[in-house]
Amino acid sequence: MAKRPYRVEVNYPKDKKPRYFLVKDVWFKGKKSKIKKSLGTNPPSEDDIKRYTDEFAFEIEFKVAEKKAEFSSNMFNFDYLNLEKVKEIERLRFLYKTFTELLTTNEIEAYEQSFEINYVQGTTSIEGNTFSLQEARDLLVDGIIPKDKPLREINEIQNFKKVKQYRDNYKGKVTIEFIKNLHYMIMDNIDYESAGIFRRTDDIVITGCDLQVAPSLLIEDDLTLIINEYYSSIENNKYTFEQAVLFHYKFEMIHPFADGNGRVGREIFNYMLNRENYPKLLFLGDDREMYIKSLKYGNKDEFEPMVKMFVNLILSQRYEILIKNLRKVVIPQKRGGQMRLTDFDNM
């Protein structure tokens, strides 16, 4: 758990009493600033400083995130979003980073477990899995298998235990091998013959899409191309979130596998976000319609509304809940020990 490095600063206005401020310095890639909160004209005692720190911690941390978002958003080149929308996403990124840095190791495990349950239930439900959120939790956490569920659906949920372990331990770039390994784990015990293997047929149709997928002979070449395009764009300061959305769409249109493309594509998308300290996107059943609609914009080469819908999804899912959860951890004396899985608001 990271400490909040606040300090007290005193200003001496001419012909006026000294004024005291609680200050946090802000540094981001060579740029610096500071956030100040006035404490009045009386010198604060150690007890005062502790009380002010707890009282103003959330306000200061929020303003720090805003300042870093201002710095970072001006460093990117973006094609489909305006500056204000980019600042919103960047503010979310830095609030999320602050939140996770304030958690203890046990609290991070509880938070990530809660997110993973929501994520797995959502990403599989998009593909037709009928597990409820509680049933997914019972299976993933307690190993309780619900009655009357098909073996395929059970394996679809359980396979994400291996996916999470692999994803969390992997620290490299997205590669062909990484993509195949994800698919193998996602489809293990479901489709033995094709798990981890690119499709060999072109007789593939994407439901609700009139466009043709990549020819099977070109799958690896096309994937290599979009992987290289993604990392080249990031190196040239293209906006990460935009580029991750575009990669996700291109991946789905290549459709490299006979089945499981959506689950693999969403894993890669969130991996790209998480590598750059953005919170992951939940693909909840309730958001299925908006998610599918956004990809359909891409089919018409209307990438601006597609990217904006992804932005709206992550902001609507994560921002308000992140604010609530940050308030819970930013003031230590009100936490009452380690936070539990149930202490966090829904992801």
Regions found by a protein language model. Name each.
Residues 1-259, 263-347:
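FIC/Doc superfamily catalytic core
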